[in-house]
Amino acid sequence: MAKQVEARYQELYVVSSQWVQNKLNQAAKDGYVTGAFGLRVRTPLLHQVIRGNRRTPYEAEAEGRTAGNALGQSWCLLNSRACSEFMAKVRASQHRLTIRPCAQIHDAQYYLIRDDLDPLMFTNEHLAKAVNWNDHPDIYHPEVGLGGELSIFYPDWSKEIEVPNGISEQGLIELVQSATG
């Protein structure tokens, strides 16, 4: 069962896995892996060994795993980039006092939004565009996209209402009414 789960994982993420391996191969030549927006993480052991054979030291393989994790996690900066883009639009709009950021966790953003249709519609439109950004050449891929959807937690955190991108005002009203009874 575990091998089947791993095989399906590898099949699902084949493009991402190959991308990481290509970056680690380059790190073995350069002595560092280049992450999001130019971040460099040194890889001195990878630079000194031949990767991928039975004589590759365990420490070098461990450094490769760590560098691969750092590479992937560095792209969590996309979440910060999306928040900055979105909040610039909020501050320039009539909603500057009705939409407030309160937390960012890995690939999620949390906002306090007044209980009003207009700021919800604004957030659903502009935040969705911001999180779909993938114009950096290191992450652009025609088949692997970025994205996300807005969720409303109402009347409390235990009640999630998933809001489809591009929903109409009437559709949002009906969605919230049906979810809150």
Protein language model regions, located:
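Conserved catalytic core of nucleotide polymerization and phosphodiester-bond processing enzymes
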Residues: 1-181
